[in-house]
């Protein structure tokens, strides 16, 4: 079952990216390195509800 998630920047707490994931394959929270336009660099983004 795929669910929609929001990715939040760990440095500035900006919620920039929307994505989806399969809960059966990835039960824990997703962490990705993505570009943050507010910081103007690549930062760690964590999954939020």
UniProtKB/Swiss-Prot annotation:
Keywords linked to the UniProt accession: Ribonucleoprotein, Ribosomal protein
One Gene Ontology MF term: structural constituent of ribosome
Organism domain of life: Bacteria
Keyword Aminoacyl-tRNA synthetase: no
Cross-referenced InterPro entries: Ribosomal_bL33, Ribosomal_bL33_CS, Ribosomal_bL33_sf, Ribosomal_zn-bd
Any Pfam family the entry gives: Ribosomal_L33
GO biological process assignments: translation
One cellular component (GO) term of this entry: ribonucleoprotein complex
Family: Belongs to the bacterial ribosomal protein bL33 family.
HAMAP family hit by this protein: Ribosomal_bL33
Identification of the protein by name: Large ribosomal subunit protein bL33A
Species: Pediococcus pentosaceus (strain ATCC 25745 / CCUG 21536 / LMG 10740 / 183-1w)
């Amino acid at each position: 079952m795929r669910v929609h998630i929001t990715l939040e920047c760990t440095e500035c707490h900006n919620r920039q990216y929307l994505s989806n994931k399969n809960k059966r394959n990835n039960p824990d929270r997703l962490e990705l390195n993505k570009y943050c336009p507010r910081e103007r660099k690549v930062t760690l983004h964590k999954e939020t509800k």
